[in-house]
From Swiss-Prot:
Protein name (Swiss-Prot/TrEMBL): Sec-independent protein translocase protein TatA
Similarity-based family: Belongs to the TatA/E family.
Region (Disordered): 43-76
Annotated organism of origin: Brucella anthropi (strain ATCC 49188 / DSM 6882 / CCUG 24695 / JCM 21032 / LMG 3331 / NBRC 15819 / NCTC 12168 / Alc 37) (Ochrobactrum anthropi)
GO biological process: protein transport by the Tat complex
Compartments where located: Cell inner membrane
SS bond list: none
GO terms, molecular function: protein transmembrane transporter activity
Basic and acidic residues bias: start-end ranges: 50-76
Record gene name: tatA
GO cellular component: TAT protein transport complex
HAMAP family, alphabetized: TatA_E
Length: 76
């Protein structure tokens, strides 16, 4: 009694088709696909901008002591 039968789903489908029409549903799905495509493109554009910003950075630093230097000083 609590679950939907096939007749419930057919009635819902008929109401949706009456409200939106046959041509409107594919148009809506196309709009959803375009939105997803634009979202993915926007995300990849942001990643490219982040990579470009990070590639320009350099770190000029020198280690004070390395492992080899420590071994040399402890053996002497």
């Amino acid at each position: 009694m609590g679950s939907f039968s096939i007749w419930h789903w057919l009635i819902v489908l008929a109401v949706v088709l009456l409200l939106f029409g046959r041509g409107k549903i594919p148009e809506l799905m196309g709009d959803v696909a375009k939105g997803i495509k634009n979202f993915k493109q926007g995300m990849s554009d942001e990643d490219a901008k982040d990579d470009a910003r990070d590639s320009g950075r350099t770190i000029d630093a020198k280690a004070d002591e390395t492992v080899n230097d420590v071994k040399k000083t402890t053996k002497s």
